[in-house]
């Protein structure tokens, strides 16, 4: 045991020496200090836990599961059984001149009078609709006008193998043989894909989507039940302060970043969203405070573009005057963009690296029209054009980009580079702001419990004194502005403590503070 202890010390020392140049480099000092402090904060949030309304969660779960069996019966009636080919059979004879029964074991009566040697026939069976079968789901939705764009991992890997010049001929041939299957069935049954089902689709297809959403809600609740602590009445999730490749925080046990949220454009697909978010709450006599960064990814994009018109639009533009970014983006996209809401959906998808297929689904247009709209949008902002044509290719060629705080983030993909800039920038700003407001509240001697940190949002539990809660919210929101100034960004950052209904984000549960 002592030898292993000595070995651990030796390995750690060699590891330290390996990274010493980076550790002592001025470029990394700010990032290293931030991430080391975030380790402590992540552990603190895990230990605090998030209060959870288990009784209401069980009621919702029972309500959801009680709808599934009747809905499955309705769908089996709406989608009649289909004839499924099991195999092609060529009857053979035995040495006695009779047909071999090897290929007829499935027959109940054993009557082979309708079959003869060498006469090929198809062995089929009726297949009832199974709402749990991805293949059958895709078949029925495709027939209803579904236009999915999110591929499964298998489909993506198949395409990579075909394009990989290092793949062996056998590997490439195998992938090419599987490609027709993936082209038909290689689509995720995800919310984004389900949203592409037209509103005019036949009722059975829409009921199928409803069933899929209910089942997803039930799975999420099951995950929460498994994580619930009966002693503390809380869920103690794990926060990995640098879990994603963009160095955003990741969450597991359960994934507290994957809580349903309302979708104004698809209210029928937001079922139970508010009710499930409301399960995350506070004990009696306490308040929950929600603070987030105002349009942080658009502001970071404005920083990188350094375009005065876009910066003004993001920070001061209004929907009423038609000077906000979503209205301007609608004009930049051209006639194919029918509404401001579509322009809003487009920009956030574009920032995450959406391809032409996804843009086509968002705008409800052809692939050719989507490509023209995207190109029009990029060309309308010189700063964005410079990013796309010069900065991104340069960073992809060198295999990394430099973050706002000096850290190097590995990325050699032009397709993912813009999302990397924005998500890493968001992570840097929000982490530094979290550290800053924690220090300030300690200085002010204001007690609080930090219970969640998701991307650009914090949830904090505090006393039921509204003045204290408002002070906490003000300190948190102001920390975002201060960090933006300290990083010397081209576009000002701002925090907000208003919820989605534009009222003060102080309440009894997460649905009231989000």
Give the residues covered by each predicted segment.
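Short hydrophobic/aromatic beta-strand micro-patches
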Residues: 459-463
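A common structural junction motif
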Residues: 476-487
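Conserved "right-hand" nucleotidyltransferase catalytic core of DNA-directed polymerases
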Residues: 1-268, 285-287, 297, 364-367, ...
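Function-dense linear segments that define catalytic or interfacial modules
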Residues: 241-337
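Conserved catalytic core of nucleic-acid polymerases
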Residues: 331-447, 452-453, 464, 497-514
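A structural signal for short secondary-structure junctions
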Residues: 281-284, 443-446, 451-455, 487-490
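Short, conserved charged micro-motifs
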Residues: 465-472
